[in-house]
Amino acid sequence: MRILIASHTYIVDLNCEKLRALAKLEPGIEVTVVVPKKWQPGGVQNRIIETEYRDEGAFKIVPISNFSQNHQGLLTFGADLISLFQKFRPQIIHVEQGSRGLAYTQMIILNQLLGLKAKNVFFTWWNLPYELKLPIALLEKYNLNHSHGIISGNQDGADILRQRGYEGEIKVLPQLGVDETLFTPQPQPELAAKLGISQNEFVVGFVGRFVPEKGLLTLLKALVNIKDKSWKLLLLGRGELREEILKIATENNIQEKLIILESVPHDEVASYINLMNTLVLPSETTYKFKTLTAVGWKEQFGHVLIEAMACKVPVIGSDSGEIPHVIGDAGLIFPEGDDQALDNCLSQLIEKPDLADNLGEKGYQKAMEKYTNKAVAQQQYEFYQLIIDN
C-alpha cells in the first residue's frame, strides 16, 4: 500500500514515530510524508523552520514548496507536488489539515486530474459546532463530498461531521501515539530527592500550559480543600497564570507544597511524570475564544494522559471534551470546574493505595493496547484497508 500523508505536524521529527511504525507494519507498505518546506509555528517557537528531505527506505519525508507559512487552513503546495504524485502514485492521500483545508482540496483535484484513483482521507481535531459562510461552506462541502474516509481525533469531532451530513467511514483516533520506550514505569528516587519530595508525600502532577482553560485554578482550590493531607503539587509548564498560582499558594500557606518547573526537555518529561502519584488534567470548556467560523474551546484529546498511563501513573480528568473517552474506566473523572469533586478524587487516591495501583495498571494496559505509536499505526492501517476494500 502506497500512503501519502500531508501535514505541517511532521516538520517535528519526534511527531513522525507513528508513521515510521506504519511503514514497518507489513512488507509492501510505503509511507511518504509531505511537509511544507518552510513553516513558522508562532508562539514560543516563533521562527521559520526549514525542513529537509529524509529517505529511510519505506518511510520518506518530502519537503514541498508552500504558499502559507503559518496558517493551517491556508496551507497549499507548489508545482513540485505534481511530480511527487506522478512518481509515487499513492493509493491513500491523507491530509491532516481539517475539513476546510485548502491543501486537501488541492490534493483531491490533483488526484482526479492525474487519474490516480487514490482514496481521499482527512484528519480533524475540531470538536465544537460551527457555522460556515460562503465561500468556506462550499469548500468544506466539496472536501466532504470527495472524502472516502475521515479520521477524527475525538468523538465530538466525529459527531459534528455526521451532523454536517457526512455519511462515509469515520474513525476516532489520535493524531499521535505515545513512545512506550520513553514513557515507561521507572522510579526516580534521585530526582525526587533533588526536588525535595519525600517518600511519604503524595505527588499531584500537571503538565501543560498555565492558562485558565486548562483548569489549574480548580486544581489549586481542590488542593487547598485538603491542604492538611501530605501532598506536593508538581507543575510542568509555563503561562499567564504563573503569578496567580504563586499568589494563591502563598495566601493559603501551601507555597512549600508547590514545585514549578518551566522548562523541561521532552525526553525528560517521562522522568518527572514517574515522580507523580497521579496526573491531573482538569481542563474546562470555554467560549471566550473566537475564530472565523466558531466560538470556544474544549479539550480535544489530552495527550499527556496517555503518557502518564504508559508510566502506570493513575490519571484524574475533568469531563471536558475527549478526556472521559481517553480515560474510560482507567482513571477518575470529575465535572469540570468542580473543585470539591476533584478533591474527592484526590482523596480517594491518597487514602486508597490499592485503588491507585489498580487504576495505574488499567491505564497502562489501555495505553499499550490502544495508544502506542505502533497501536495507533495499526488502527490507522486497518482503516485504510477498510476504505480501499469499500
Q: Which role does the model predict for each range below?
A:
Residues 297, 305, 310, 314-317:
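Short hydrophobic beta-strand element within catalytic cores of glycosyltransferases
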Residues 194, 198-202, 216, 220-260, ...:
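A conserved nucleotide-sugar
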Residues 317-319, 332-339, 348-353:
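Conserved acidic donor-binding segment of nucleotide-sugar-dependent glycosyltransferases
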Residues 348, 355-370, 381-382:
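A short, well-ordered alpha-helix in the C-terminal region of glycosyltransferases
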Residues 1-59, 116:
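N-terminal subdomain of nucleotide-sugar transferases
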Residues 274-298, 313:
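Acidic donor-binding loop of glycosyltransferase active sites
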Residues 35, 137, 144-188, 303:
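Donor nucleotide-sugar binding/catalytic pocket of nucleotide-sugar-dependent glycosyltransferases
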Residues 8-11, 98-102, 110-134, 146-149, ...:
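A short, histidine- and acid-enriched strand-loop-helix "catalytic/donor-clamping" loop
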